Amino acid sequence: MAVEDDVSLIRTTTLVAPTRPTITVPHRPPAIETAAYFFGGGDGLSLSPGPLSFVSSLFVDNFPDVLTPDNQRTTSFTHLLTSPMFFPPQSSAHTGFIQPRQQSQPQPQRPDTFPHHMPPSTSVAVHGRQSLDVSQVDQRARNHYNNPGNNNNNRSYNVVNVDKPADDGYNWRKYGQKPIKGCEYPRSYYKCTHVNCPVKKKVERSSDGQITQIIYKGQHDHERPQNRRGGGGRDSTEVGGAGQMMESSDDSGYRKDHDDDDDDDEDDEDLPASKIRRIDGVSTTHRTVTEPKIIVQTKSEVDLLDDGYRWRKYGQKVVKGNPHPRSYYKCTTPNCTVRKHVERASTDAKAVITTYEGKHNHDVPAARNGTAAATAAAVGPSDHHRMRSMSGNNMQQHMSFGNNNNTGQSPVLLRLKEEKITI
């Protein structure tokens, strides 16, 4: 009997299944009602004050009492999020890309819109400091722009025209220039503007633009002009940092004569030191030096005549219209500036023309052999002293040159002319 009761109890327990719990899903409201449910509008037409309102559903509205701007107590987290502390009043929106300047400046807040955690006096002080800083920056920028001393566009610079030769009293016209290796400034070529005046000069400058050398070629056949052409005409005269400078600005006559430039360059070594004007400082002095130029023409089979002095050949060049080149020599005695060039006549191949320039500052060196001694004795110190004492233009003098037995070296003509060079 007891066993049957146990079996029936087990059978009853096995057959009865437990009841499952059920979940009831509430009715889903429309979209407008859902927005009203979340944002608390009630009528479904209010907008969200911000994305932080969604967070309010995650917290329990049991915060301590908080004072709202209208001095009302609230314990709602939503009220805390929508308070002016998180959402200060926004300025009206402006259309367009550029806004007026006064609208971009910060505006002080009204006392009723101050966050409850900041006193109104503090907020006014902050906005006032910002406005003061902006106005100070604007005023400094305006003063810097209007002040000529700070404006880079109004800076004055001392401009020195480096293409003007030093004034020597004559009027010059530039007719060409040539670049120089290792120098930024080219060599300039000038000629006297006086009618039929053959004088030319070359001006060289250093790397800093200062005039270092002026070489004159020829002799002026006129006096210095009295009425100098001023800046009112086409010729300009200006006073610069390196002294008074003058140059003709006649661009129509600016030309490049390659033949003249080549001749001038190759004649540099042929010029005596007295013809070269070197400028070491700002101020220069002008003095006239009388430099004799002796031309000897003789019949000879050799080009270099034995006149008792020792010479060293330093170059030669081709002469136009002459098949024979011109050779250049300089005296080998130290500190002696005498030079000569030797060439044959274009019409007579046996005629040797020797041109001496300068004065020897020493005696005739000792003769190396008898022939040289006889030649030195014939042309010796007495003749050279006589040459140095002669003056005047286009003077001709016959002299005994060399050994009388050697008829091949008897000179036929000696021309001595005086040159006045301003240095």
UniProtKB/Swiss-Prot annotation:
<dbReference type="Pfam" id="PF03106">
    <property type="entry name" value="WRKY"/>
</dbReference>
<feature type="compositionally biased region" description="Low complexity">
    <location>
        <begin position="99"/>
        <end position="111"/>
    </location>
</feature>
<keyword id="KW-0805">Transcription regulation</keyword>
<dbReference type="InterPro" id="IPR036576">
    <property type="entry name" value="WRKY_dom_sf"/>
</dbReference>
<keyword id="KW-0539">Nucleus</keyword>
<feature type="region of interest" description="Disordered">
    <location>
        <begin position="91"/>
        <end position="128"/>
    </location>
</feature>
<feature type="region of interest" description="Disordered">
    <location>
        <begin position="215"/>
        <end position="284"/>
    </location>
</feature>
<dbReference type="GO" id="GO:0043565">
    <property type="term" value="F:sequence-specific DNA binding"/>
</dbReference>
<dbReference type="GO" id="GO:0005634">
    <property type="term" value="C:nucleus"/>
</dbReference>
<dbReference type="InterPro" id="IPR044810">
    <property type="entry name" value="WRKY_plant"/>
</dbReference>
<dbReference type="GO" id="GO:0003700">
    <property type="term" value="F:DNA-binding transcription factor activity"/>
</dbReference>
<keyword id="KW-0804">Transcription</keyword>
<dbReference type="InterPro" id="IPR003657">
    <property type="entry name" value="WRKY_dom"/>
</dbReference>
<protein>
    <recommendedName>
        <fullName>Probable WRKY transcription factor 58</fullName>
    </recommendedName>
</protein>
<feature type="region of interest" description="Disordered">
    <location>
        <begin position="142"/>
        <end position="171"/>
    </location>
</feature>
<feature type="DNA-binding region" description="WRKY 2">
    <location>
        <begin position="300"/>
        <end position="365"/>
    </location>
</feature>
<feature type="compositionally biased region" description="Low complexity">
    <location>
        <begin position="144"/>
        <end position="162"/>
    </location>
</feature>
<dbReference type="GO" id="GO:0031347">
    <property type="term" value="P:regulation of defense response"/>
</dbReference>
<feature type="DNA-binding region" description="WRKY 1">
    <location>
        <begin position="161"/>
        <end position="225"/>
    </location>
</feature>
<feature type="compositionally biased region" description="Acidic residues">
    <location>
        <begin position="259"/>
        <end position="271"/>
    </location>
</feature>
<comment type="function">
    <text>Transcription factor. Interacts specifically with the W box (5'-(T)TGAC[CT]-3'), a frequently occurring elicitor-responsive cis-acting element.</text>
</comment>
<keyword id="KW-0238">DNA-binding</keyword>
<keyword id="KW-0677">Repeat</keyword>
